[in-house]
């Protein structure tokens, strides 16, 4: 009998303990709920009749609150997106399944603007680089042309100096060949006499117009070869102009007469020696100051070719 009583007391204690645990669990869940959940729980336990208009206002208010919450969420996401995009962390838009169409379109527009901006910057840099390259090429071309001009001018200057030096040396040698030996004469007097003899040599040929080289050599007590060399030197110095035939005659022709002959040949085109000889009487004056006149035919009796040295 005592055992039965003991078992009954144990069963009652177990039931009381189970009920206490259930009540404690229910109280804990009730405390965690928010005020809205408590209100809803109370409303369900004690339903209070509400008017339709009040329910509409409350629904509109809840919808407005949800819209504000969504906009705030979008703004926060935009700020986050802009911050990382400006810092260069967001290279391409990250798509999410929960992302709306409007947000997706906005991200695509941002990506397109960024790509367009990068393309414009690349084109601008490329344009600047091309301009700099053209400017460098232009400066290099100007420097090259300037250097070529300087080199050409320097070469022409050196050539002119060498020619002048060579002509001057030839002139000195020519003067020395006409020097005379006079006892008691100074260097200045000898140089003056040499210059006088040189000018006399030139005037002798110009005045006679047509001279035999042997006669010139005999007149100035020179060898015929020396006379030829002196005439060639004077022609290179533009002190004499004329032609030498194969019979040892030198015909002096002035610059004006050479220009007239050149004009005649240019007007007629190609001309033969005989045609030139026929027209030379009217183009070249062969009258000498001390001798009788000569004709060009007397100089060109043979068909030998005449060389003109201008």
Swiss-Prot record:
Xref: PANTHER family: DDRGK DOMAIN-CONTAINING PROTEIN 1
Protein name as annotated: DDRGK domain-containing protein 1
Job of this protein: Substrate adapter for ufmylation, the covalent attachment of the ubiquitin-like modifier UFM1 to substrate proteins.
Region (Disordered): 38-85, 110-162
Family note: Belongs to the DDRGK1 family.
Segments crossing the lipid bilayer: 1-21
Compositionally biased tracts (Acidic residues): 76-85
Keyword Transmembrane tagged: yes
InterPro entries, per database record: DDRGK_dom-contain, DDRGK_domain-containing, WH-like_DNA-bd_sf, WH_DNA-bd_sf
Protein topology in the membrane: Single-pass membrane protein
Keywords carried by this UniProt record: Endoplasmic reticulum, Membrane, Transmembrane, Transmembrane helix, Ubl conjugation pathway
Residue spans of biased composition, Basic residues class: 52-70
GO molecular function annotation: ubiquitin-like protein ligase binding
Cytoplasmic side: 22-310
Entry's localization field: Endoplasmic reticulum membrane
Cellular compartments per GO CC: endoplasmic reticulum membrane
């Amino acid at each position: 009998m005592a055992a039965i009583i003991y078992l009954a007391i144990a069963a009652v204690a177990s039931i009381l303990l189970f009920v206490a645990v259930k009540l404690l669990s229910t109280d804990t869940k009730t405390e965690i709920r928010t005020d809205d959940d408590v209100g809803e729980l109370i409303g369900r336990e004690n339903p209070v009749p509400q008017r339709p208009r009040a329910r509409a206002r409350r629904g509109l208010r809840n919808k407005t609150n949800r819209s504000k919450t969504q906009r705030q969420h979008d703004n926060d996401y935009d700020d986050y997106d802009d911050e990382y995009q400006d810092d260069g962390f967001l290279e391409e838009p990250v798509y999410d399944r929960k992302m709306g169409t409007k947000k997706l379109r906005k991200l695509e527009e941002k990506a397109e603007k960024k790509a367009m901006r990068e393309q414009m910057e690349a084109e601008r840099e490329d344009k600047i680089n091309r301009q700099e390259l053209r400017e460098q090429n232009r400066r290099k071309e100007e420097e090259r042309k300037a250097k070529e001009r300087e080199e050409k001018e320097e070469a022409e200057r050196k050539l002119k100096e060498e020619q002048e030096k060579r002509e001057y040396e030839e002139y000195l040698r020519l003067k020395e060949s006409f020097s005379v030996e006079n006892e008691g004469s100074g260097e200045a007097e000898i140089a003056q006499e040499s210059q006088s003899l040189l000018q006399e040599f030139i005037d002798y040929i110009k005045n006679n117009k047509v001279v035999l080289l042997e006669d010139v050599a005999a007149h100035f007590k020179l060898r015929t070869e020396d006379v030829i060399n002196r005439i060639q030197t004077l022609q290179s110095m533009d002190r004499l102009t004329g032609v030498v035939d194969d019979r040892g005659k030198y015909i002096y022709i002035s610059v004006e007469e050479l220009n007239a002959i050149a004009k005649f040949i240019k007007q007629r085109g190609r001309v033969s020696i005989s045609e030139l000889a026929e027209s030379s009487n009217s183009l070249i004056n062969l009258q000498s100051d001390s001798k009788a006149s000569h004709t060009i035919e007397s100089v060109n009796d043979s068909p030998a070719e005449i060389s003109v040295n201008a």
